């Protein structure tokens, strides 16, 4: 790699953000980029060594820990050769390991948690000035994350947080202890952010929360009363934003899924016919041990209602294999739910012991070989179901939002890729009724000609092509940004801004 490191203190310093984990982390990394851009840092060009490397971490699975510390160790020789280089670690694993991170990786300069992302520029400057590692973990949000600037990664699709934290107590999950109790944003703030993104050409937004259909239980603004119908109304309000073509959300909790949300999904044209709803297990006994607060028939009844209201809806899920005490009978019940639910795809995981969770102390932890064998059977079943469901799409005309980075073999197959409204990945031939160059962010229609377990194929060419402002922005190399609120952070080569007091979460 080419180095971009600089020797003068006044020179512009470059950064790179490496992200692990869920969509919330991806969006948090956009905020990290926004903060550093606002402070005068510059994103390092691809293929170069950055002056500052930030790891935004995940703590859900043990292999995430191992991967992170392995990657940090690879930077130790670079750090030794260039003392001016800085390494920062944030996110859930940093919130969990705290000072212990420095014991494992003493060459790290900054450790920050999930609640104080906004402190990163100040911590970097303090570590540089004092020549001493800085560890700052706080137990509650300093500012609602939406108060922070964000540099978006896509010209056409954007994440929008509607809440942070989680009130559930799933025994396998460490996230609530790291991200805190649920706090909901004001509806007006959310819609204002969506409108600002649409004004910059964004066509698709995904509403983010650990449990989106609990939205309304605890607004950050104490003046707003608790409202269990708030999420359904938020979906309908998104439907009234001119220029917003696609709305998605993730993830709902089956225990709190209400009929008014299904009605809002079906009656709001820009809400996509897609639902990602975690199952975790098809065994009622295991669901109880997980503290999931619903049972398999309740889960299946929600799917039935969604498909009754939206017959073409694609349902996706998460499933954990090998939870402590899971018997072959329990596993067979999971397979039966998979057969009945007909998921269009599933994120499947082998249970991983997470210290600090109730499940870590449960008896009857399963041998690795048993978990692996069950996992393989689940994958085989789900792939057969997915293939059958995808084959049903053959012959249909579908709308596709052209995307970038989705088709790993597009260069070999002379195809481009995008996402259908129901979230399915589509590989298509870039020929036919095309209005100029096809660009990520443009909208096309194609006929599905083939199917595989993980994608659809459209090899008969493009039926129609609509150029969009998102495509214009992508072509020009422009990405949307949301400025947030000035937080008075130190700047490197950027004008100082007047400090603005932030209402934050109202905490």
UniProtKB/Swiss-Prot annotation:
Q: Where is the Radical SAM core domain?
A: 152-388
Q: Which EC number(s) are documented for this chain?
A: 2.8.4.3
Give me the stretches of Basic and acidic residues compositional bias: 459-478
Q: Which CDD domains match?
A: Radical_SAM
Q: Which reaction does it catalyse?
A: N(6)-dimethylallyladenosine(37) in tRNA + (sulfur carrier)-SH + AH2 + 2 S-adenosyl-L-methionine = 2-methylsulfanyl-N(6)-dimethylallyladenosine(37) in tRNA + (sulfur carrier)-H + 5'-deoxyadenosine + L-methionine + A + S-adenosyl-L-homocysteine + 2 H(+)
Ranges for domain MTTase N-terminal: 13-129
Cofactors demanded by this protein: [4Fe-4S] cluster
Family annotation (PROSITE patterns): MTTASE_N, MTTASE_RADICAL, RADICAL_SAM, TRAM
Q: Where is the TRAM domain?
A: 391-462
Q: Which Pfam families match?
A: Radical_SAM, UPF0004
The protein's matches in InterPro entries, at most eight in alphabetical order, are given as:
Elp3/MiaA/NifB-like_rSAM, Methylthiotransferase, Methylthiotransferase_CS, Methylthiotransferase_N, Methylthiotransferase_N_sf, MiaB_methiolase, rSAM, rSAM_horseshoe
Cite the residue spans of the region called Disordered.
459-492
In its keyword annotation, does this UniProt entry include Metal-binding? yes
**SUPFAM superfamilies (UniProt xref):** Radical SAM enzymes
The GO cellular component terms are: cytosol
Protein family according to the UniProt entry: Belongs to the methylthiotransferase family. MiaB subfamily.
Query: Could you tell me what this protein is called?
Result: tRNA-2-methylthio-N(6)-dimethylallyladenosine synthase
Gene symbol here is miaB
């Amino acid at each position: 790699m080419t180095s971009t490191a600089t020797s003068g203190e006044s020179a512009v310093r470059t950064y790179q953000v490496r992200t692990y984990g869920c969509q919330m982390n991806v969006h948090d990394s956009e905020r990290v980029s926004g903060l550093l851009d606002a402070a005068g840092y510059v994103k390092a060009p691809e293929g170069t060594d950055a002056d500052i490397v930030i790891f935004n971490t995940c703590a859900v699975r043990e292999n995430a820990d191992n991967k992170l510390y392995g990657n940090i160790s690879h930077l130790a020789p670079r750090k030794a050769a260039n003392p001016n280089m800085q390494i920062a670690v944030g996110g859930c694993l940093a919130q969990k390991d705290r000072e212990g991170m420095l014991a494992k990786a003493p060459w790290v300069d900054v450790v920050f948690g999930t609640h104080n992302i906004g402190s990163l520029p100040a911590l970097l400057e303090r570590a540089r000035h004092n020549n001493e590692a800085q560890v700052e973990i706080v137990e509650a949000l300093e500012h609602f994350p939406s108060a922070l600037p964000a540099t978006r990664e896509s010209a056409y699709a954007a994440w929008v947080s509607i809440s942070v934290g989680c009130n559930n107590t799933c025994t396998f999950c460490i996230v609530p202890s790291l991200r805190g109790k649920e706090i909901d944003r004001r509806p007006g703030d959310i819609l204002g952010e969506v409108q600002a993104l649409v004004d910059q050409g964004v066509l698709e937004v995904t509403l983010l929360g650990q449990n989106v259909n609990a939205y309304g239980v605890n607004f950050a603004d104490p003046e707003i009363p608790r409202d269990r119908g708030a999420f359904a109304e938020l979906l309908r309000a998104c439907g009234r934003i001119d220029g917003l073509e696609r709305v998605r959300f993730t993830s709902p909790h089956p225990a709190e899924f209400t009929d008014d949300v299904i009605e809002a999904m079906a009656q709001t044209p820009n809400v996509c016919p897609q639902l990602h709803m975690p199952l975790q297990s098809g065994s009622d006994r295991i669901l109880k041990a997980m503290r999931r607060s619903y049972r398999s028939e309740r889960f299946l009844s929600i799917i039935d209602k969604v498909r009754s209201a939206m017959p073409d809806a694609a349902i996706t899920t998460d499933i954990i294999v090998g939870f402590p005490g899971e018997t072959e009978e329990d596993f067979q019940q999971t397979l039966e739910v998979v057969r009945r639910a007909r998921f269009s795809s599933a994120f499947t995981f082998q249970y991983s012991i997470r210290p600090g969770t109730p499940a870590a102390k449960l008896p009857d932890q399963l041998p690795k070989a048993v978990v692996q064998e069950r996992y393989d059977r689940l994958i085989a079943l789900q792939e057969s179901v997915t293939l059958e469901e995808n084959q049903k799409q053959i012959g249909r005309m579908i709308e596709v939002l052209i995307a970038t980075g989705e088709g790993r073999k597009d260069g070999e197959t002379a195809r481009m890729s995008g996402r259908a409204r129901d979230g399915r990945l589509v590989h298509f031939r870039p020929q036919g009724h095309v209005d100029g160059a096809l660009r990520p962010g443009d909208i096309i229609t194609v006929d599905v000609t083939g199917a595989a377990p993980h994608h659809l194929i459209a090899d008969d060419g493009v039926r129609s092509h609509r150029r969009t402002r998102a495509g214009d922005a992508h072509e020009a190399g422009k990405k949307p940004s949301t400025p947030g609120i000035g937080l008075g952070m130190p700047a490197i080569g950027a004008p100082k801004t007047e400090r603005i007091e932030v209402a934050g979460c109202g905490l």
